[in-house]
C-alpha cells in the first residue's frame, strides 16, 4: 500500500476519493491527523496530514513516531512525503520541483528512533542512502511522462524550526553543500527506514529571496501554489 504524507502546502488532497477515515492509536500516541483511505487515480492509498488538517502542529512538535508506526500497522510499504522547501542553491528556481537524494540533519531533541534499548533492542540502521532509489525512479518516470521538469539530485537540510534561519546559518548550510531547506524530513525518513518502508521526498521549491524580508510575497505564494498543483496532478497519475 502507498501512503502520501502531506506537508504545510498539502494538508488536504482534493483529488482523493475518500472511502474511510480512521483514528489510529499507537504505542506512541495519536497521529497528526485521522488517516484517510481512498482512491487516487488508479491506486488505493492512504493520506496523512503531517501538520494536521488545519496546520496546527509545528515541525518540532509533530509525533513522527506515531505517524510512521500507524502507517506501518496499516500495511503501508511505500511513502511519498510532500513538502514545501526553501531553495538556497541559486540554480533552484522559485516554483520548481525537486526530488532530494541525500540529506543533512540539523535538528535536535526529536524522538528519532523506535529502537531505544527498552522494549526494542538498539539497532544501528543503515542510512547511507536515505531515500529509496526505486521509489524515486518511479516518481522521476512519472514527471518525465508528463514533461514536467524536476531536479533529480539535491541535498535536503532539515532544520529544527519553527523559526527561519539567519543569514549566517544560511551561509553555513551552503558551505555544507545543502541545496534546499525544510523542517520535517527528519526523523520521518529515518523512522520509515527502521520499519523497512520505502520513502521518497517530493518537494516544491520557494526561493530564499521570498524570505529575505521575513514576509512571504504574493508572487512567492502563487509559485508555491502552482508547484503544489503540479505535484497533485502527478500524484493523480500514479
What is each residue range found by the language model?
Residues 1-127:
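Metabolite-binding pocket within alpha/beta catalytic cores that recognizes anionic/polar moieties
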Residues 55-60, 158-160, 177-178:
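Short, flexible loop segments at the rims of nucleotide/cofactor-binding pockets, characterized by
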Residues 68, 170, 186-189:
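Generic hydrophobic/aromatic pocket-lining and core-packing "Φ" positions
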Residues 72-75, 91, 176, 190-198:
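Alpha-helix C-terminal capping segments
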Residues 128-174:
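Active-site rim beta-loop-alpha module in soluble metabolic enzymes
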Residues 183-219:
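Zn-dependent metallopeptidase/amidohydrolase metal-coordination segment
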Residues 210-238:
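His/Asp/Glu-rich mid-to-C-terminal helical/loop segments that flank catalytic regions of hydrolases
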Amino acid at each position: 500500500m502507498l501512503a502520501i504524507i502531506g506537508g504545510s502546502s498539502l494538508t488536504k488532497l482534493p483529488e482523493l476519493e475518500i472511502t474511510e477515515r480512521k483514528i489510529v492509536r499507537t504505542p506512541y500516541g495519536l497521529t497528526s491527523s485521522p488517516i484517510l483511505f481512498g482512491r487516487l487515480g488508479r491506486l488505493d492509498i492512504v493520506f496523512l496530514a503531517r501538520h494536521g488538517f488545519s496546520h496546527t502542529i509545528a515541525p518540532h512538535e509533530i509525533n513522527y513516531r506515531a505517524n510512521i508506526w500507524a502507517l506501518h500497522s496499516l500495511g503501508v510499504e511505500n511513502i511519498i512525503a510532500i513538502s514545501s522547501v526553501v531553495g538556497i542553491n541559486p540554480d533552484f528556481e522559485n516554483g520548481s520541483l525537486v526530488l532530494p537524494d541525500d540529506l543533512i540533519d540539523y535538528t535536535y531533541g526529536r524522538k528519532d528512533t523506535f529502537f531505544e534499548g527498552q522494549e526494542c533492542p538498539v539497532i544501528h540502521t543503515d542510512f547511507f542512502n536515505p531515500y529509496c532509489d526505486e521509489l524515486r525512479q518511479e516518481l522521476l518516470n512519472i514527471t518525465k511522462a508528463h514533461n514536467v521538469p524536476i531536479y533529480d539530485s539535491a541535498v535536503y537540510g532539515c532544520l529544527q524550526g519553527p523559526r527561519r534561519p539567519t543569514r549566517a546559518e544560511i551561509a553555513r548550510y551552503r558551505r555544507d553543500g545543502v541545496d534546499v531547506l525544510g523542517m520535517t524530513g527528519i526523523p520521518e525518513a529515518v523512522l520509515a527506514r527502521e520499519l523497512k518502508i520505502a520513502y521518497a521526498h517530493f518537494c516544491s521549491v520557494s526561493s530564499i529571496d521570498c524570505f529575505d524580508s521575513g514576509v512571504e510575497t504574493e508572487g512567492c505564494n502563487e509559485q508555491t501554489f502552482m508547484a503544489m498543483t503540479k505535484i497533485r496532478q502527478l500524484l493523480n497519475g500514479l
